[in-house]
């Protein structure tokens, strides 16, 4: 019974490893098409064994921000047609292979915030309510406009 369970875990690990390898292949191909790839080394462990000053990632102090935003590049879909009105923020961490891309559809113009509604203190008590004389509108009021910000920095 133990060997059947162990064989199941081994098969699941093999399937996961194959799936991750396939995903890595397509991610690298998409990055190469977008011009985001780094030059590949023939010996991957050579960078880990190199001197600290020889690595591609600069050393930063603990108080400095670990990332930088690169805004305003047009996002191209995998098919190749650019999407309209989208801005691409690339999040680059201090460690390799940790890049997050977020696309947002930004409006051309953000409307101003809404004015505050009339309160009971602004309305005289002896005057008839304007709602009693006009037709009642049963539609929902418009929601406030969304606030678009770049994605938060990962910590």
Curated annotation (Swiss-Prot):
Residues 1-21 form the signal peptide. GO terms for cellular component: fungal-type vacuole. Residues 35-155 are annotated as: Disordered. Residues 118-128 have a biased composition (Polar residues). Keywords: Signal. This is Uncharacterized proline-rich protein C70.10. It comes from Schizosaccharomyces pombe (strain 972 / ATCC 24843). The lineage of its organism: Eukaryota, Fungi, Dikarya, Ascomycota, Taphrinomycotina.
